[in-house]
Amino acid sequence: MRFTKMQGIGNDYVYVNCFEEHVENPSELAKQMSRRHYGVGSDGLILICPSDVADFEMKMYNADGSNGGMCGNGARCIGKYVYDRGLTDKTTVSLMTDSGLKILNLNVKDGKVQTVRVDMGMPELFPPKIPVDLPGEVVMGHRLN
């Protein structure tokens, strides 16, 4: 399987172009490839997929195989990947994610992407809507020491 490893401000992911490759079990692949000492080593796996509603779709898996939802730095790397490899000639790219539609603005110089800006939308800061999976009793709306 062909893949690319990229990083954006230290967030490193393994990228698979699903226009060319088929990934049977992305959760398991993420776990195997992300192992730092026995795999490629990464924060997770990002699949670059076709989309019916956007230019591309991002499917992200954390190193433990769980669904990652969305990563801004990962999305920025997708912008560079799809432009530099000729999958698009647009400098404004729409990207469907599990967190909704994101718009990537590519700054191109001499035919290569120099920077990518992602409109991430408004952050969610309401504590009950921010998932945290920890062992023990569920506590909402209380300060923890």
Model-derived regions, located:
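Active-site proximal loop and beta-alpha junction motif in alpha/beta enzyme cores
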Residues: M1-M70, A75-N145
